[in-house]
């Protein structure tokens, strides 16, 4: 119900972070208790982690109002919550705009949440030496499953199949914490599927032998000429399926897009290795701000 009003605030500033993507917000909104407040300049976030720590993220407002909205967030933390301000995933442009005094704040880069940005055309074609291995895996998939695979777009009506796939996909993960993470993600995916008429996104899927084996969700922001990919899942036992859905989704859904943001690696070694293997053209740095 708040989507349209929140979307207006999200359009005021467009840093290239996944966190500035409203689709990403709604997929992960149920992870922790989260609320917001507004004034005539912007929207300010407050969230509470499992261990009871309060934190915020960069306000949604125009550049010229950022300092005012930042201080409004700090005031809420100090006066209402009786806490020092902690703000995560702050983009570099915001840090530069805020010009925070060193004697009052600690500002530190956080590699864990840096986003990976790619040349979209390279991901469509996997051309060049750097993508030789990806191209080999992709071709192996096409050879192995020739005549047996199909790319499709999915929608709300496919929700049961998508949720069943996520349950199966979870079996490949042994970590209990990761299971909770996947369950939370599934709740968010269910929400955007059930409200597809208000969200602007596309879901691509790959079927092998008429069975759903991979799906991905993405949306496009014209101001950055950027596709954002908050979700991509594939059966890890099918060689070349991940490169195939990555490439084919861009070809079918966003053929003209210049860049793709594939989000952060959450500090997970395996995920970092995977994201680096797609050869990002740059990283979107993010910072943590802590009030002293």
Which sequence ranges carry the predicted segments?
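Short, conserved active-site entrance elements at the starts or edges of catalytic domains
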Residues: 157, 161-211
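Generic N-terminal amphipathic/basic segments
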Residues: 1-28
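Conserved catalytic-core motifs of GNAT/GCN5-like acyltransferases
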Residues: 108-116, 281-292
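Aromatic (often tryptophan-rich) hydrophobic motifs at membrane interfaces
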Residues: 200-290
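Conserved donor-binding loop and adjoining core beta-sheet/short helix segment
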Residues: 18-93, 98, 207-238
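Acyltransferase donor/substrate-recognition loop-hinge adjacent to the catalytic core
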Residues: 102-176
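Short catalytic-loop micro-motif centered on adjacent basic/acidic residues
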Residues: 86-87, 150-152, 259-262
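Conserved active-site alpha-helix within GNAT-family acetyltransferase domains
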Residues: 94-108, 136, 267-283
């Amino acid at each position: 119900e708040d989507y349209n009003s929140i979307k207006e605030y999200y359009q005021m500033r467009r840093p290239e972070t996944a966190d500035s993507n409203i689709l990403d917000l709604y997929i992960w909104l149920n992870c922790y208790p989260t609320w917001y407040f507004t004034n005539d300049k912007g929207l300010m976030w407050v969230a509470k982690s499992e261990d009871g720590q309060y934190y915020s993220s960069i306000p949604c407002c125009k550049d010229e109002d950022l300092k005012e909205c930042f201080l409004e967030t700090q005031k809420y933390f100090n006066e209402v919550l009786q806490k020092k301000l902690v703000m995560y995933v702050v983009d570099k442009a915001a840090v530069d705009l805020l010009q925070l005094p060193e004697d009052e704040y600690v500002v530190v880069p956080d590699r864990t949440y840096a986003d990976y940005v790619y040349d979209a055309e390279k991901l469509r074609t996997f051309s060049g030496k750097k993508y030789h291995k990806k191209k080999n895996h992709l071709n192996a998939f096409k050879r192995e499953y020739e005549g047996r695979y199909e790319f499709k777009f999915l929608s709300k009506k496919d929700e049961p199949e998508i949720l069943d796939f996520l349950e199966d996909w979870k079996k490949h993960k042994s970590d209990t914490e990761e299971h909770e993470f996947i369950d939370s993600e599934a709740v968010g995916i269910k929400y955007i599927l059930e409200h597809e008429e208000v969200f602007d996104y596309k879901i691509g899927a790959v079927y092998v032998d008429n069975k759903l084996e991979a799906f991905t969700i993405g949306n496009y922001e014209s101001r950055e000429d950027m596709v954002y990919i908050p979700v991509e899942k594939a059966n890890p036992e099918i060689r070349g399926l991940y490169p195939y859905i990555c490439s084919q989704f861009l070809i079918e859904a966003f053929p003209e897009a210049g860049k793709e943001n594939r989000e952060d690696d959450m500090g997970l070694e395996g995920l970092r290795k995977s994201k680096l293997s797609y050869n990002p053209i740059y990283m979107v740095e993010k910072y943590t701000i802590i009030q002293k």
